[in-house]
Amino acid sequence: WIMGHMVNAIAQIDEFVNLGANSIETDVSFDSSANPEYTYHGIPCDCGRTCTKWEHFNEFLKGLRKATTPGDSKYHEKLVLVVFDLKTGSLYDNQASDAGKKLAKSLLQNYWNNGNNGGRAYIVLSIPNLAHYKLITGFKEALTSEGHPELMDKVGYDFSGNDDIGDVANAYKKAGVTGHAWQSDGITNCSLRGLDRVRKAVANRDSSNGYINKVYYWTVDKRQSTRDALDAGVDGIMTNYPDVIADVLNESAYKAKFRIASYDDNPWETFKN
């Protein structure tokens, strides 16, 4: 999965997919009542990027729905996965469940079209704080009470705080999650970070009793760091330059071993090295 980083304006969906992304990451900010409000990152952000592009969350979802609904004039067949980077840092811990419920209702209405031929992309809910695990249970409760528990098949999870892998496993246990687990590791492109924790995550994925299904690394903009991440065995790379990742995947060393994921590749299934 080539994951376009910080895609917060509808116009950027086309831009990143046309550069080679089959997945995008979108920031979601919340208001003080735990409603998802804007697709917005804010300052500071990655070096070389504009930090302030934004849409109202529900409007972004409608644009995203068009981009992922077969037959729509804006449809991109290769856009198959969306990571919502949930900026829950503005919320109190006890608002996490509410945030999950409100997020689910927004998605149901504006992305899944109330279960009637909505967008088809798989969705990853990426949560920065292990203490906010109830966002997952709230999300699930809302979809169930709205009569669409089947949509949970399209939803996966990520805790993005670079926490100890054992602590992440524990948070999933509390949330009642088994499966659909993506594990991110990384740092802003302005800094360097080693691959030690990525290797631990890959080892967990490849073990018989690990909780991780997929591992992705962020934010990778250079050819050499792309090669290093691929050599470590990641499933996804988040980037500001999807064309760089696509170029490296075309190199003879990687062409035989990796390919770009399509809609038929189940993002919740573990593919072991």
UniProtKB/Swiss-Prot annotation:
Needed cofactors: Mg(2+)
Cofactor note text: Binds 1 Mg(2+) ion per subunit.
Subcellular location field: Secreted
SUPFAM superfamilies for this protein: PLC-like phosphodiesterases (SSF51695)
GO biological process: killing of cells of another organism; lipid catabolic process
GO cellular component: extracellular region
Residue positions with a glycan: 189, 250
Enzyme class: lyase
Primary localization class, coarse: secreted
InterPro entries to which the protein is assigned, alphabetical: PLC-like_Pdiesterase_TIM-brl
List of residues binding Mg(2+): 25, 27, 85
Entry's family note: Belongs to the arthropod phospholipase D family. Class II subfamily.
Function description: Dermonecrotic toxins cleave the phosphodiester linkage between the phosphate and headgroup of certain phospholipids (sphingolipid and lysolipid substrates), forming an alcohol (often choline) and a cyclic phosphate. This toxin acts on sphingomyelin (SM). It may also act on ceramide phosphoethanolamine (CPE), lysophosphatidylcholine (LPC) and lysophosphatidylethanolamine (LPE), but not on lysophosphatidylserine (LPS), and lysophosphatidylglycerol (LPG). It acts by transphosphatidylation, releasing exclusively cyclic phosphate products as second products.
The protein's name in its UniProt record: Dermonecrotic toxin LapSicTox-alphaIB1bi
Organism encoding this protein: Loxosceles apachea (Apache recluse spider)
Species lineage: Eukaryota, Metazoa, Ecdysozoa, Arthropoda, Chelicerata
